[in-house]
Amino acid sequence: VGKEVEVDAICDGTDVFVPGIMELVERTGVHSGDSISVYPPFSISDKVKGIILHYTRKLGLAIGIVGLYNIQFIVDKNDCVYIIEVNPRSSRTVPFLSKATGYSLADIATEVILGKTLKEQGIFSIYPEEKKRNYVKVPVFSFSKIRGIDSYLSPEMKSTGEAIGYDDKLNRALYKALQASGLKLQNYGTVFVTVCDKDKEEALPLIRRFYNLGFNIEATSGTAAFLKANGIRTRKLK
């Protein structure tokens, strides 16, 4: 368990360019295409960023990649960085990162493949200064249109599209992205909750936030008893 982080990079055989590091919101184990991605990363340290850049450069040169590649990492609670996978190809996050950073990664990578180095294209730093604005990519799902699909997120990708939001504030960027994805975000109503025993304590702060915002809480018997014991008025569903 940890934070999942993703990079798209370009290697010309001598130098490496990483236009941005993306932090994923969902837990590890959810397919990266079904996870919310945020650039610039919002909770990893400069030390971890340095390790990620070091690994990205070392892997690109060792494998002998010329062009685009994608690496997914896990960062644990002790800031140890682990590699999930390396993909020697373009990825679905290239358009998002191109829009967020202003670098046309497809154009740069094409020039590299044709023999023009990164330095010849005016790129001298492995990692440019991060943008001040927040960019968020959210998945778009079609569960209401495609029958028989389990909506539980897993390593199997289930999203059918993507949407982007950006703003100076991260929470507003996320709100815009969710709106763009077609979600109707309510500021009132009822939240149904059912949580297994091992996750109840972890889920409590989130449920309490909904409760404090004025949402009605409904839950299955075990979850309802737990919430009532923690001061959250809950309607038990039978």
Q: Language-model features: where?
A:
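Short internal beta-strands
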Residues: G214-F226
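Glycine- and Gly-Pro-enriched alpha-helical subdomains that act as flexible
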Residues: L183, Y188-T190, V195-F215
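A general structural motif
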Residues: L170-K176, V195-D199, I217-A219, K238
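Glycine-rich phosphate/ribose-binding loops and adjacent secondary-structure elements
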Residues: A203, A224, L237
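Short hydrophobic/aromatic-enriched beta-strand-loop microsegments
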Residues: G231-K238
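ATP-dependent carboxylate activation and anion-phosphoryl transfer catalytic cores
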Residues: V1-N187
